[in-house]
UniProtKB/Swiss-Prot annotation:
Annotated pathway: Sulfur metabolism; hydrogen sulfide biosynthesis; hydrogen sulfide from sulfite (NADPH route): step 1/1
Database matches in InterPro entries: CysI (IPR011786), NiRdtase/SiRdtase_haem-b_fer (IPR005117), Nit/Sulf_reduc_fer-like_dom_sf (IPR036136), NO2/SO3_Rdtase_4Fe4S_dom (IPR006067), NO2/SO3_Rdtase_4Fe4S_prot (IPR045169), NO2/SO3_Rdtase_4Fe4S_sf (IPR045854), NO2/SO3_Rdtase_FeS/sirohaem_BS (IPR006066)
Gene3D superfamilies with a match to the protein in the record: Sulfite Reductase Hemoprotein, domain 1
Name of the protein: Sulfite reductase [NADPH] hemoprotein beta-component
NCBIfam families assigned: CysI, PRK13504.1
Any GO CC annotation of this UniProt entry: sulfite reductase complex (NADPH)
Binding residues annotated for siroheme, in chain numbering: C478
GO MF annotation, one: NADP binding
Family statement: Belongs to the nitrite and sulfite reductase 4Fe-4S domain family.
Species of the source: Pseudoalteromonas translucida (strain TAC 125)
Amino acid sequence: MSEQDKNVKLSDNERMKRESNFLRGTIATDLKDEITGGFTADNFQLIRFHGMYQQDDRDIRGERAKQKLEPLHNVMLRARMPGGIIKPEQWLAIDKFAEEKTSYGSIRLTTRQTFQFHGVLKPNIKGMHQLLDSVGIDSIATAGDVNRNVLCTTNPVESELHQEAYEWAAKISEHLLPKTKAYAEIWLNGEKAETTEEPILGSNYLPRKFKTTVTIPPNNEVDVHANDLNFVAIAENGKLIGFNVLVGGGLAMTHGDTATYPRKADDFGFIPLEHTLKIAEHVVSVQRDWGNRSNRKNAKTKYTLDRVGVDVFKAEVEKRAGVEFASSRPYKFTHRGDRIGWVEGIDGKHHLTLFIQSGRILDYPDKPLKTGCRKIAEVHQGDMRMTANQNLIIAGVAANQKAVIEEIARNHGLIDDKDTEQRKNSMACVALPTCPLAMAEAERYLPSLVEKIEALLAKHGVPNDSIIMRVVGCPNGCGRAMLAEAGLVGKGPGKYNVYLGGNLEGTRIPKLYLENVGEDVYLAAFDELIGQWVNERNDGECFGDFVIRKGIVAEVKVSVTDFHA
C-alpha cells in the first residue's frame, strides 16, 4: 500500500482484500452452506478474483420474491484464455459442461476474447473448475482488482508474427498472475501453502481492474483504447522487434458523474522485446502504488494518469524498470472488424471466421450453432480462436478439410449469406437477464435494433453500408460502446443515452448526442442522420467521421475536458 493511502479513508474493498488471506476468505466454508445458493459477505466479492461473478435470473426475481424465495443465485464464470486460443478437445469439454450443468445451456464468447458460462448453480461450481483444470483451462484473475485476460490480435493469416505476439500475450498473462495458491486450494483440492507476499500485485492487489492487450497493426480488433496497457507490435521484415507501449485507456463511467469518463491510452514510446515483461510489471506497480484506493469510481489507471500527469507516470515506470522508452515507431490502424469467411494464410493453411451474433453459442430453432461448433471440434485438426469481436475462428484448416468444415458450418447456420455488414458490425454486452448492473436490454435487443437500422440504410439507398454500432446495458464499458460510431448506453428500461462520433479504426471517443431517450426518438434521429450522411458525405467517409465534420457532435480530443463539455 502506498504512502498516500495511509492518510485517506480507504474503500471497503481494500479492507476486504487485506483481510482475505490472499484471496481465500471463507469461500471454502461458503461452498458447503446449503441454506443459500449464493456467497455471503466478502466472499461475494472475493470469488471475482477466481473468475466468477454472483448473479441471478432477473426475469424471475420478482416472482421468486412473491413466493418468499431468495433470488435464483448462480455464478457466471469467465475463463482465462490469453489470446483467445482454444483446442478442439477443450471446446468439446466446455460444450458438454454448458449443456449439462448450466441453466442456459450456452457458451458466451466475450469482448475479452474468452468464453463465459452463465447460470452455474452452487453445487456445480467446484466440479466446473475441476473439469476446466482437467483440460488445461482456469479462470484465475479474469475478474477482480488484478490484470485480467490478456487479449491478442487473432491474425492467423500472418502465422509467424501472430505466433510471436500470442506467446508474448501468454508470457505477460503468466507474469502478472496472482501468486497466491488460493485457487488451487479451494477449487482443485490443492495442498494448502501459506502465501506471504504478492511480489507484483501487492497484498492489497490493484486499486481496480487492469486490462492488457498485445495487438498487431493494422488490425485494432482488441480496441487498444479500452485497455490500461497495450503492446502494439512493431515488425521489420516480418519479424517482431518490439512494441510501442500505450497506457491509460478505459471506457467505464458512471451516469451523472462528470468526474468519470472514457479515455484513450497515451503512447509512452517504443521498447525492444527483452524489456516487455519488465515494463508490464512496472506499469502495474506504479498503478498499484499510485492508484486511488479511496474512490473506486476514480481508481483506474486512466484517472491516475490524469491526476499525476502522463510524463510523471511514465518517468516513474522508467525509473522502476531501469528502461527508457525510445521514440514511438510508426504504425497505423485501418480497421478492427473480423474478416468473416475463409482466408488463406501465408503458411498455406485456411482459416474460417464464423460470425456469432453477440457471441452467444446456443442451438436456436433455425440455427443450431452449438451443435455445429461441436461437430466442427470433433473433426478439426487445428485450433479455434475467440475474437474480441465475439466471433470464432476455425484456424489452421488443411486444404483437404475445407469442404468438410464448410459443410458443417452451413448446415448449422454458422455461415449465413444473409448476414449483412450492419449485423456483422454491431455488438452488445450480455445485460439482462443475468447481469446485475444492467439498466436496459442489450444482447436480447440487438437483433431487433439491427433490423431497424438495416431498414433505414435500405430506405436511404445504401443497404450494403454499415455503421459500427454497439449497445450496452450500463455505462461500465463491457461492450465497448464508447469506441463505436454509434453507441447506445442503457439508462433505464427501454431508455438509452446515444453517443456519436467514434471512427472505423477505434481511435476516437464518441460524444453524447441524445440523453435518456426511447426507441422512437433515437430511430427518428438515425433516420435523419443516415439521410444526411448518404447525401452529404465525402467519398468513402464513414458515419462517425461525417457527424464530426458536420458538427453534429463535437470531437472528443481530451476526455477530461471535452467528453462532458
